Swiss-Prot record:
Name of the featured protein: DNA ligase
InterPro entries reported in the protein's UniProt record: BRCT_dom (IPR001357), BRCT_dom_sf (IPR036420), DisA/LigA_HHH (IPR041663), DNA_ligase (IPR001679), DNA_ligase_AS (IPR018239), DNA_ligase_CS (IPR033136), DNAligase_adenylation (IPR013839), DNAligase_N (IPR013840)
Family stated for the protein in its record: Belongs to the NAD-dependent DNA ligase family. LigA subfamily.
Lineage: Bacteria, Pseudomonadati, Pseudomonadota, Gammaproteobacteria, Enterobacterales
Taxonomy, superkingdom: Bacteria
Catalyzed chemical reaction(s): NAD(+) + (deoxyribonucleotide)n-3'-hydroxyl + 5'-phospho-(deoxyribonucleotide)m = (deoxyribonucleotide)n+m + AMP + beta-nicotinamide D-nucleotide
NCBIfam families attached to this UniProt entry: dnlj (TIGR00575), PRK07956.1 (NF005932)
Organism field: Escherichia coli O81 (strain ED1a)
EC number: 6.5.1.2
Gene symbol of the encoding locus: ligA
Length: 671
């Protein structure tokens, strides 16, 4: 007679086998009723013997107790986004860039996949067992959705097969099939619940439930498309090979993944999928095209937030016609005046659209747009609504001219348009309430100073009540003053004050990004910080010297130089420093006085380190006389390559620069 342990093992193995056949192979061999019977039998046995329940048992998908809030998971390897192309000409230009950059006659084979319209997730397996899952978040840090992901039947709690790595991070898309989406909305209408606009919103809402038991009731599914962390094992040296290996281990992979031998075959695949799109049973918004060879991927490397070896070829956005009821003018963080069309609300690609960007005065002139016109609206990239064209044949008689303002609609300051620029700007600077609001929202944002709990509505009120005029004023706020805002109790106010205090400790790169200098994004801010090291050096830099920083041209250099030349900006920076904003200062050491293999060398770190943080490694290298740079150039002496090193490693190899790994770095640090 079999023991209870043997019965449980057999039932779990049988259920996992049938889950694999159903979700991965799409070839179920037993009726749903038989699957349900086996599940009931397993559940009954586990109820009688709770001490024998294992975390990877199929019964453990039903969901744990509700969470108070999501915790954060830092991605060991950043989850980058993809660059987009929207037409054949742009794709062919991308194809040419890839061929040119490879600088060889070696053939490029493309692996093409469906671009699923769902939620990107990262799933970590240790010794084949699912241990954690996270959303993409900002690419560096995501939300811990482990409990919810465990409820998705398509995702195995335990991988099966041979040669499974000790640590394997699988990346893919969680999405909701059309049938499941329609059923959720049908149930919601019947019970008075929330009706979702589209399957993507429904998938996101289902996956980000604090109560996993709700997620368990939603028919979410999953396809994997890539890998993050890989330790203690190997994977094939092609992208398609890796996907097929994932499938062999029990992970679901789309059956539409296709290998294309040329750009022409890629375009044929794109048009085939576009034709089949309505019958797939789930939403996609394009195809993803990747260089199949991992060696070529490594050679091509990355730009700031995207790989050079992949692109998303988006489908033309859905379009609808409606009427322009008015045109209003919004003022952005840098004073840019943006015309916005107020529309007769219309559903476009599952979303009710009532506003659309008109970009600038030139665009209004190009369109020949008048208030009252009938227009075609497109959700560009299925996200940002825009006016495509005016239906002139149906123009009403009572249309009105759109008059671009000569004075700021918010503060009344002059509006000027610099020759050669399409954008007109308010000249009011921070005396303009709109610019002040947007500048402050940028300053406190997650990727800038990261002030937790200070949302847009709080900033709006602070500006409207004249409590805050510059970023430095934020750090002068008290809990007592904040309680004067709507829906702000003493406890919430104190939390904001505490968050502001915590935000004072930052990095030089984050501080530069938070200042909101025109054209200075995160990557440029990091480059400037790494190159100059100190605020004083950056403030004193000439336009010519600024252009020595990688990826900084004359336009960006001019904006940076002009920003620091402006006395009011320097005053704000002085106030911020006086309020206690600080970051680790580089230690200046005479390299000639140090007996170290790193002394006097320009060193670049790339990839992720496992034994110490990047910041700790940089600090130790500087202590030993090295200059740590943010990018690889002919002046670089040494590159330290951690896990998943990308474009910097490729460039170092191309330039013949010495490369060492983390183990060798640690040995030299200790020598």
């Amino acid at each position: 007679m079999e023991s209870i342990e043997q019965q449980l093992t057999e039932l779990r193995t049988t259920l996992r086998h049938h889950e694999y056949l159903y979700h991965v192979m799409d070839a179920p061999e037993i009726p749903d009723a038989e699957y349900d019977r086996l599940m009931r039998e397993l559940r009954e046995l586990e109820t009688k013997h709770p001490e024998l329940i294992t975390p990877d048992s199929p019964t453990q998908r039903v969901g744990a107790a509700p969470l108070a809030a999501f915790s954060q998971i830092r991605h060991e390897v950043p989850m980058l986004s993809l660059d987009n192309v929207f037409d054949e000409e742009s794709f062919l230009a991308f194809n040419k860039r890839v061929q040119d950059r490879l600088k060889s006659n070696e053939k490029v084979t493309w692996c093409c996949e469906l671009k699923l319209d769902g939620l990107a997730v990262s799933i970590l397996y240790e010794n084949g067992v699912l241990v954690s899952a996270a959303t993409r978040g900002d690419g560096t840090t995501g939300e811990d959705i482990t409990s919810n992901v465990r409820t998705i039947r398509a995702i195995p709690l335990k991988l099966h097969g041979e040669n499974i790595p000790a640590r394997l991070e699988v990346r893919g898309e969680v999405f909701l099939p059309q049938a499941g989406f329609e059923k959720i909305n049908e149930d919601a209408r019947r019970t008075g619940g929330k009706v979702f606009a589209n399957p993507r919103n429904a998938a996101a809402g289902s996956l980000r439930q604090l109560d996993p038991r709700i997620t368990a009731k939603r028919p979410l599914t999953f396809f994997c498309y890539g890998v993050g962390v890989l330790e203690g094992g190997e994977l094939p040296d092609t992208h398609l090979g890796r996907l097929m290996q994932f499938k062999a281990w029990g992970l679901p992979v789309s059956d539409r993944v296709t290998l294309c031998e040329s750009a022409e075959e890629v375009l044929a695949f794109y048009h085939e999928v576009e034709k089949d799109r309505p019958t797939l049973g789930f939403d996609i918004d394009g195809v993803v095209i990747k260089v199949n060879s991992l060696a070529q991927q490594e050679q091509l490397g990355f730009v700031a937030r995207a790989p050079r070896w992949a692109v998303a070829f988006k489908f033309p956005a859905q379009e609808q016609m409606t009427f322009v009821r008015d045109v209003e003018f919004q003022v952005g963080r840098t004073g840019a005046i943006t015309p916005v069309a107020r529309l007769e609300p219309v559903h476009v690609a599952g979303v009710l659209v009532s506003n659309a960007t008109l970009h600038n005065a030139d665009e209004i002139e190009r369109l020949g747009l008048r208030i009252g016109d009938k227009v075609v609206i497109r959700r560009a990239g299925d996200v940002i609504p825009q006016v495509v064209n005016v239906v002139l044949s149906e123009r009403p008689e009572d249309t009105r001219e759109v008059v671009f303002p000569t004075h700021c609609p918010v503060c009344g300051s002059d509006v000027e348009r610099v020759e050669g620029e399409a954008v007109a700007r308010c000249t009011g600077g921070l005396i303009c309430g709109a610019q002040r609001k947007e500048s402050l929202k940028h300053f406190v944002s997650r990727r800038a100073m990261d002030v937790d709990g200070m949302g847009d509505k709080i900033i709006d009120q602070l500006v409207e009540k004249e409590y805050v005029h510059t970023p430095a004023d934020l750090f002068k706020l008290t809990a007592g003053k904040l309680t004067g805002l709507e829906r702000m109790g003493l406890k919430s106010a104190q939390n904001v004050v505490n968050a502001l205090e915590k935000a004072k400790e930052t990095t030089f790169a984050r501080f530069l990004y938070a200042l909101g200098i025109r054209e200075v994004g995160e990557a440029t801010a990091a480059g400037l910080a790494a190159y100059f090291g100190t605020l004083e050096a950056l403030e004193a830099a000439s336009i010519e010297e600024l252009q020595k920083v990688p990826d900084v041209g004359i336009v960006v250099a001019s904006h940076v130089h002009n920003f620091f030349a402006e006395e009011s900006n320097r005053n704000v920076i002085s106030e911020l420093l006086a309020e206690g904003v600080h970051w680790p200062e580089p230690i200046v050491i005479n390299a000639e006085e140090i007996d170290s293999p790193f002394a006097g060398k320009t060193v670049v770190l790339t990839g992720s380190l496992s034994q110490m943080s990047r910041d700790d490694a940089k600090a130790r290298l500087v202590e030993l006389g090295a200059k740590v740079a943010g990018s690889v150039s002919k002046k670089t002496d040494l590159v330290i390559a951690g896990e998943a090193a990308g474009s910097k490693l490729a460039k170092a190899q191309e330039l013949g620069i010495e490369v060492i790994d983390e183990t060798e770095m640690l040995r030299l640090l200790g020598s």
